A protein has these predicted regions:
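DNA/chromatin major-groove-contacting recognition/catalytic segments
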Residues: 302-328
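A positively charged, amphipathic N-terminal helix/segment that binds anionic biomolecules
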Residues: 1-159, 165-277, 281-288, 293-297, ...
Length: 333
C-alpha cells in the first residue's frame, strides 16, 4: 500500500468486523505462503501486497485476514503458544491509544482523593475482606503489580498480585519484599515500606502455609482468596471511572518517565535528549517488569517525551500526590 493510499484510508471511517465472518486465508506453499479468498481462489497481486503490509508473523497458524482494508481488525492467528493474536488497523490502534492515555490522565487526576479513602479502609481488621481488597488496590498503586490469572499460575508458574502465595513475601527489617516470577517468566522484586500495608501483609502471612494464597480473608477457620475481578471492581468504585489495574500501570509508567526527565539536566543536542528519554523509558520498564520497547510502545504516554523535547517538564516534586498533579497539569496544558 502506498503512503498516499494509506493516508487516504485513515480519513475513511473504519468498519467493525468479526473474524467469524468470511475472510481470506493464508496457507503454506513451499517455503512461503499462498493467500486465498473465501471461495478458495488466489488473491490478486495488489491484494497480496496489502496482506504482506500487515506483517503477519510466519509462525502464526489458522490465519484469518479481513478482505476490507477499512476493517478495524485486519488479521487473526494462533501463535506458537496456542494463543489467539490480533492485528488491528493502525488508525484503530491510534484511537485506542489516545483513549487509553486520556483515561490514565483522569485516573491520575483522581488518585490523590482515592488514596485518602484507601487510608481509612486500610485501618480495618487486616484479615477482613474490605481491608484486604483495599490493600490490594494500594499495592497496585505503589508496586505497579499486574493482578495475575489463575491459568498462568497453574500452567506457567507465573504470578500476579492476586495469585501470589505467602512464600513470595520476605521480611527485610522495616520492608517487605515481594519476589516472584511474573508474566513472560520475568523475575520481579518489589519493595514495600508503607507501615500500614506492612501490618496487613504480616497479618496475612502469619502462621499460614507457604503455598497459601497471600490475598485472602479469614472466614472462621478457612481462608477465602481475593480474585482479580474483585480488585478491579474496587478500583472502579473508588475512582468512579471505568479503569482497571492495567490503567494504573500506564499512569505509573508515564509519571516515572516524567519524573526522571524532570530530574536530569536537559541535553542540548538531539542525540543527548534521545539518550535521556531512553534512560527514562528503561526506568519505567524496570518498574513494569517489561522490556523498554514494550514500555515505550504500550505504557508511556508519548506526549511526556514530546514535551521534554520541546523543553517542558514537571519540575521537582516531593510526594506521590504532587507527582500525579504535576503530570496531569503537564499533559493538559
Amino acid at each position: 500500500m502506498t503512503h498516499a493510499a494509506h493516508g487516504y484510508l485513515l480519513q475513511v471511517r473504519l468498519r467493525t468486523v468479526s473474524c467469524q465472518g468470511p475472510g481470506w486465508r493464508r496457507v503454506r506453499h513451499g517455503r512461503g505462503f499462498r493467500y486465498l479468498d473465501a471461495d478458495g481462489e488466489a488473491l490478486a497481486p495488489e491484494q497480496v501486497d496489502r496482506v504482506k503490509d500487515l506483517v503477519i508473523p510466519p509462525a502464526w497458524t489458522d490465519v484469518w485476514i479481513c478482505p476490507d482494508e477499512r476493517g478495524h481488525l485486519q488479521a487473526v492467528g494462533t501463535d506458537a503458544a496456542g494463543r489467539r493474536q490480533y492485528v488491528y488497523h493502525p488508525e484503530w490502534r491510534r484511537k485506542r491509544d489516545e483513549q487509553k492515555f486520556d483515561r490514565a490522565i483522569e485516573l491520575g487526576r483522581r488518585l490523590p482523593h482515592v488514596r485518602t479513602a484507601l487510608k481509612r479502609q486500610l485501618l480495618g481488621d487486616p484479615v477482613e475482606r474490605e481491608t484486604v481488597v483495599a490493600a490490594a488496590v494500594r499495592l497496585v498503586d505503589l508496586g505497579c503489580f499486574r493482578l495475575g490469572a489463575e491459568t498462568y499460575a497453574e500452567e506457567n508458574g507465573s504470578f500476579g498480585l492476586t495469585t501470589l502465595q505467602v512464600r513470595h513475601v520476605q521480611r527485610d527489617g522495616d520492608a517487605r519484599i515481594f519476589r516472584f516470577v511474573g508474566k513472560g517468566g520475568i523475575d520481579h522484586e518489589i519493595v514495600i515500606v508503607d507501615r500500614t500495608l506492612i501490618g496487613i501483609i504480616d497479618a496475612l502471612t502469619e502462621h499460614r502455609r507457604a503455598d497459601g494464597r497471600l490475598l485472602a480473608t479469614r472466614e472462621g477457620r478457612r481462608w477465602l482468596s481475593i480474585d482479580a475481578a474483585e480488585v478491579n471492581e474496587r478500583i472502579r468504585e473508588l475512582l468512579r471511572l471505568d479503569v482497571t489495574a492495567k490503567d494504573f500501570r500506564t499512569w505509573k509508567a508515564t509519571t516515572t518517565v516524567a519524573q526522571h526527565l524532570a530530574n536530569v539536566e536537559r541535553a542540548t543536542s538531539g542525540s543527548g535528549r534521545a539518550r535521556q528519554a531512553r534512560e527514562a523509558i528503561e526506568q519505567a520498564a524496570e518498574l513494569l517488569g517489561n522490556t523498554p520497547s514494550v514500555a515505550r510502545s504500550a505504557y508511556v504516554d508519548p506526549r511526556v517525551i514530546d514535551l521534554f523535547e520541546d523543553g517542558h517538564t514537571i519540575g521537582r516534586v516531593r510526594s506521590e500526590n504532587g507527582l500525579d498533579r504535576a503530570v496531569v497539569a503537564l499533559l493538559t496544558k
